[in-house]
Regions:
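Membrane-interfacial amphipathic/re-entrant helices at transmembrane-helix boundaries
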Residues: 1-64, 92, 104-118, 145-150, ...
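Transmembrane alpha-helical segments in multi-pass inner-membrane proteins
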Residues: 67, 111-112, 116-124, 245-255, ...
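Single transmembrane alpha-helix segments in multi-pass membrane proteins
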Residues: 47-98, 133-147, 282-293
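Helix-loop-helix "hairpin" substructures at the membrane interface of multi-pass membrane proteins
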Residues: 191-269, 293-298
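Cytosolic-side transmembrane-helix boundaries in multi-pass membrane proteins
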Residues: 1-36, 148, 152, 167, ...
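Transmembrane helix-bundle core of multi-pass membrane transporters
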Residues: 137, 141-216, 243-246, 267, ...
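Alpha-helical transmembrane segments within multi-pass membrane transporters and channels
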Residues: 103-156, 163, 298-303, 333-334
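Peri-membrane helix termini and adjoining interfacial loops of integral membrane proteins
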Residues: 5-6, 99-103, 170-183, 300
Length: 343
């Protein structure tokens, strides 16, 4: 019996993971929502512009939320401090870009991308290190204690925001967008911002990379097995503690990447940037299903669609509309679009 379970944990996908691969019904929600929005918006060009903007926004949210959903699913940790990594990553990227003003303002795409790539590398490296320390000092003592997790991680977020005020000041900062990524490409009557195309490419690349790691590597199989049954993985002799740390650090790095993309999208930066986006990130995590990368990806697109469509039609209810979306989906599927765990 142990050998059979071991094969499931380390060499074969758990049954719920295999089962949801063939479930394409939730995917239909994306085109259904888009079609439903068209008559309300009226103008097809405006509708298409909003839809493209939603895809770009969805990719940024996915990058941020993907790490958090694995932390939720594998570690069973309610990390409200995830917003701290979003903000710190964005500020580290800004600090890196400012001395590279010559590269950013150059007309050469290679220099622009080199500056952006270096800023992203610094942001991800910095948030990885901070994430490791955060897990050791704040998360580890409260494993299995959800109320304490909420309190201490929220406290960590507040402390991080205050430290940002100390090191970078409390005023709003400009986030320099490279010259080559400014402006838009016109396709027919639709203007598509260049930067949005980049964010879509980055988001898709992260999604594909995570799928490959989770489905084609031993580490990925262990992570998926840990999401499904942590006790069985430990019984097989694997050190789930190390897996916890690796996943938390990776999630922190992705938050740093997502924070950088989000700040560049806004072209401004404040200490509260993490708090501003973390609500949408948690909605995505809950909608998608704890531990499900596919569900997180789909949930990110749905949330971004709802935010963009309602933001155009009725800006005051944009956030409320996403909460309503979450309620409707949970009434339909209480464990999320693609439930991986039974928790």
């Amino acid at each position: 019996m142990v050998e059979q379970d071991g094969a499931t944990a380390a060499g074969e996908a758990p049954e719920p993971i295999r089962a949801h691969r063939a479930d394409y019904l939730p995917v239909l929600l994306v085109p259904a929502l888009a079609v439903a929005a068209l008559p309300l918006i009226g103008n097809p060009v405006t509708w298409l512009t909003l839809t493209i903007a939603a895809l770009a926004m969805g990719m940024m949210i996915f990058v941020i939320a993907s790490g958090l959903t694995l932390v939720f699913g594998l570690m069973d940790v309610l990390n409200f401090g995830h917003g701290a990594f979003i903000a710190i990553g964005a500020y580290l990227a800004m600090t890196t870009l400012i001395p590279l003003a010559g590269w950013i303002q150059a007309d050469q795409l290679a220099l622009n991308l080199a500056a952006l790539g270096l800023a992203i590398l610094v942001a991800m490296a910095g948030t990885s290190i901070i994430g490791w320390a955060f897990e050791r000092v704040i998360i580890m003592p409260v494993y299995g204690q959800h109320l304490k997790q909420i309190l201490v991680t929220t406290g960590g977020l507040i402390v991080a925001e205050q430290l940002i005020h100390v090191f970078w000041g409390g005023e709003q900062k400009p986030m320099p967008l490279p010259t080559a990524l400014r402006g838009a490409i016109t396709i027919g009557d639709v203007a598509v911002e260049k930067y949005r195309l980049l964010t879509m490419a980055v988001g898709l690349a992260v999604f594909v990379a995570m799928l490959l790691v989770l489905n084609r590597t031993k580490l990925g199989l262990l992570i998926r097995a840990g999401v499904e049954n942590r006790e069985m993985v430990e019984a097989l002799g694997y050190r789930i503690r190390r897996l916890f740390v690796a996943v938390f650090v990776a999630g922190s790095a992705l938050a740093g990447l997502g924070g950088t993309l989000w700040a560049l999208y806004r072209e401004t930066l404040t200490a509260g940037i993490g708090s501003e986006v973390i609500v949408l990130v948690f909605i995505v995590t809950i909608i998608g299903g704890l531990g499900s990368i596919g569900g997180c990806f789909l949930g990110s697109v749905l949330v971004a669609q709802m935010a963009n469509y309602t933001g155009y039609l009725a800006p005051k209810v944009a956030l409320a509309s996403n909460i309503l979306l979450m309620v409707i989906i949970l009434m339909w599927r209480p464990q999320g679009l693609y439930a991986v765990t039974g928790r």
